[in-house]
Amino acid sequence: MTDLHSLESDLLAQVEGAADEAALEGVRVAALGKKGAVSELLKTLGSLSPEERRERGPLINGLRDRVQGAILARRETLAEAALAARLSAERIDVTLPVREGPETRGRVHPITQVIDEITAIFGDMGFAVAEGPDIETDELNFTALNFPEGHPAREMHDTFFLPPGRDGTRKLLRTHTSPVQVRTMRSQQPPIRVICPGRTYRHDSDQTHTPMFHQVEGLVIDRTATLAHLKWILEEFCKAFFEVESVKMRFRPSFFPFTEPSAEVDIQCSRKGGEIRFGEGDDWLEILGCGMVHPNVLRQCGLDPDEVQGFAWGMGIDRIAMLKYGMPDLRPFFEADVRWLDHYGFRPLDIPSLVGGLTG
């Protein structure tokens, strides 16, 4: 009969002497594998008498458990030694000279920069920033904004509609950031001064239009808000944004369902050699739409048009970015071309402010 004590001493010595994981695995197979020494002993238990089995069984099982424990402990020791060796080999010599940094660094996208510029300008006037979801209800995007049934903007060819829900209602990708104004008027009491930047979506794609574009709208609700206040705000914005000392503006009558009266705003500019300059010249360029908030919109938001009034405006962020920084095509804004971004992008620390300058 096998001497269990001698076998255990021999196996534990082999485990301790295993220099690497492969050698340790060989010891494990020789001891505990299907035909290993300990496994063969366990097979003999079936041929023993009950008395011998009760005496021999615990001894063999104990041997198996101790060998297994020794193998696990040795495996952990080998793993720790391997890790220590790898860390030692990969140690960084901090006395070596550093490598030169990359020639190019990340750039802030022009859209992000222009949004920050707009926020800085209106923030200086006391405006807060309001945001809302890109997916909106038909009620918030159209009905609450005085769009009548059958209006062209409600048609599939102009708006991205989502499949109807179980209750039959359908949601859509907002066509403007005006729903944020509705949410603000329903959740806050006047006086209200907010700007609403964000993504908007329409079926349109060419050199100056994309299916997704960026828009910023402004809203003022108060007891005494007038068109004169609107004109002053827009004039101050244009001077600050285009960084000119003065700018002439003209308001042309227009129509928007959510404002009455409504106007489109042109600013003075010159066009020479393919370059547009603002604050000079005898030409005009349209940049935004505006008007007094329609009484029906105020009612939809729970406000009394006999008690409060207000004005709103909206402009395309992508468009004014193109105008200010001389970008001829809108499509590269969304093409992730690193060369284009290196040319038109901004340094990360060029944070716009009216004190330090919008463009650094």
Curated annotation (Swiss-Prot):
What reaction is this protein's catalytic activity? Answer: tRNA(Phe) + L-phenylalanine + ATP = L-phenylalanyl-tRNA(Phe) + AMP + diphosphate + H(+)
Principal location class: cytoplasm
Example of a GO biological process term:
phenylalanyl-tRNA aminoacylation
One of the Pfam families matching this protein, by short name? tRNA-synt_2d
The UniProt record lists the EC number as 6.1.1.20
* InterPro entries with a match to the protein in the record: aa-tRNA-synth_II, aa-tRNA-synth_II/BPL/LPL, Phe-tRNA-synth_IIc_asu, Phe-tRNA_ligase_II_N, Phe_tRNA_ligase_alpha1_bac, Phenylalanyl-tRNA_Synthase, tRNA-bd_arm
> Per UniProt, where does Mg(2+) bind?
E260
Keyword Magnesium: yes or no? yes
Q: Does the keyword Transferase apply?
A: no
Relay the cofactor remark from the entry: Binds 2 magnesium ions per tetramer.
Task: Give the SUPFAM superfamilies listed for this entry.
Answer: Class II aaRS and biotin synthetases, tRNA-binding arm
GO cellular component terms, alphabetically, are:
cytoplasm
Keywords, in A-Z order: Aminoacyl-tRNA synthetase, ATP-binding, Cytoplasm, Ligase, Magnesium, Metal-binding, Nucleotide-binding, Protein biosynthesis
Highest taxon of source: Bacteria
Q: Which GO terms describe its molecular function?
A: ATP binding; magnesium ion binding; phenylalanine-tRNA ligase activity; tRNA binding
Q: Which cofactor does it need?
A: Mg(2+)
Please give the start and end residues of each transmembrane region.
none
UniProt subcellular location: Cytoplasm
The cross-references to PANTHER family, in alphabetical order and at most eight, read: PHENYLALANINE--TRNA LIGASE, MITOCHONDRIAL, PHENYLALANYL-TRNA SYNTHETASE
Quaternary structure annotation from Swiss-Prot or TrEMBL: Tetramer of two alpha and two beta subunits.
Write the protein's name: Phenylalanine--tRNA ligase alpha subunit
Originating species: Methylobacterium sp. (strain 4-46)
Q: What is the lineage of its organism?
A: Bacteria, Pseudomonadati, Pseudomonadota, Alphaproteobacteria, Hyphomicrobiales
